[in-house]
Design a protein with these regions (language model features):
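Fe-S ferredoxin-like electron-transfer domains
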Residues: 53, 62-213, 222, 227-254, ...
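N-terminal cofactor/phosphate-binding cores enriched in small/glycine residues
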Residues: 16-75, 89
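Short helix/loop capping segments that flank catalytic or ligand/cofactor-binding pockets
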Residues: 88-90, 178-181, 223-225, 232-233, ...
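Eukaryote-biased recognition of intrinsically disordered, low-complexity regulatory segments
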Residues: 4-16
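Cofactor-/ligand-binding subdomain signature composed of acidic, glycine-rich
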Residues: 269-321
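Catalytic and ligand-binding motifs that coordinate phosphates/metal ions
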Residues: 247, 251-280
Length: 321
């Protein structure tokens, strides 16, 4: 007798039957039927890490809530997204993340999700003073007073002309680590250092980025959901209050640096290039680029308009050959 593999599975979500391709997740099923679940660590081109825990749902027969981004949908499952337990869990997690990290530069989706869940990070108290989070001595974290909220605040790291690492906005979603590691770039320039509340993203031995294994592909920037990792030009504009996506145009083109044929989305504002990304659904890039594709456009400016020659492998505004 020949066994035929199932190509679809059918489950019930919020009382409605939904059918999705076999191997799909609960999150995919929810989105298929238009249910808007919050996600912060999920990336469509990355293996789900279920690190942020903001996509939790109720699964009938399960003692605990399950992460919808990573739980594979099975035939006959009965899932509820709007139970009091599930909604309270998502609300609390978003409040904790928002009280510890600055989410002002996260996507508009995050603001919408927090509003729909009535999440109020300020209820934990005013932010505590910043503490040194990078030290060779473990266990340095001092809990704040009861009327203060512990934060991950620290000065932004501006070490070159390409990247800014502003870890006061980091929620430890691990997307940058996965993109730099075996899921995309295979460079392994960054990882998680420290334990507990002291955990943070770090280069090897906490060296400055230009002295690390980083190849400046910018793929970590592309997946960061909160603005903890950003291109220097975008970060400068946001600090100055001049970044305005409503005024930006996106032009699709093909990178000319080599013959691979990576698609580029060139973002312009007021007639100037401010960012370059790649579409997630492009079969070659999956949203990834190299230093030339992501940052090799700076040569179009010259003189006083050109970025400086500091760090990151740029020479006179051009990526190395």
């Amino acid at each position: 007798m020949t066994m035929t593999a199932r190509t679809t599975v059918t489950a019930t979500v919020n009382g409605i039957e939904v059918t999705v391709p076999a191997g799909g997740t609960i999150l995919e099923a929810c989105r298929e039927m238009g249910t808007d679940l919050p996600t912060m660590c999920f990336g469509p081109t990355l293996t789900p890490a279920n690190a942020c825990r903001v996509c939790m749902v109720e699964l009938e027969g399960s003692r605990v809530l399950v992460p919808s981004c990573s739980r594979v949908l099975e035939d006959g499952m009965v899932i509820n997204t709007g139970t009091a337990r599930a909604e309270n869990s998502r609300k609390l997690v978003m409040e904790l993340l928002g009280s510890a990290s600055e989410l002002d530069r996260a996507s508009d989706d995050v603001s919408r999700w927090m509003e729909s869940h009535r999440a109020d990070p300020t209820r934990f108290g005013s932010p505590a003073d910043a503490v040194a989070r990078e030290t060779p001595t473990p266990g340095h974290h001092k809990p704040p007073s009861l009327d203060e909220a512990a934060t991950v605040a620290e000065p932004a790291k501006v070490e070159d002309d390409l990247y800014v690492r502003d870890y006061s906005r980091c929620i430890l979603c691990y997307k940058c680590v996965d993109a730099c590691g075996d899921q995309h770039q295979n460079t392994f320039a960054i990882s998680v250092a420290g334990r507990g509340f002291d955990a943070h993203i770090s280069t090897e031995f906490d060296v400055a980025l230009p002295g690390s294994a980083c190849v400046y592909c910018g793929n970590c920037i592309a997946v960061c959901p909160t603005g903890a990792l950003e291109g220097k030009i975008a970060w400068d504009m946001k600090e100055a209050g001049t970044w305005d996506e409503s005024k930006q145009e996106v032009t699709r083109t093909v990178c000319s640096y080599c013959g691979v044929g990576c698609n580029l989305d060139v973002h312009t504002q007021d007639g100037r290039i401010v960012d370059v990304t790649s579409p997630l659904d492009h079969e070659v890039t999956l949203g990834n680029l190299c230093i030339k594709g992501r940052f090799g456009w700076m040569y179009v400016y010259s003189g006083a308009d050109a970025p400086s020659e500091a760090g990151g492998g740029l020479e006179g505004g051009r990526p190395p050959s």
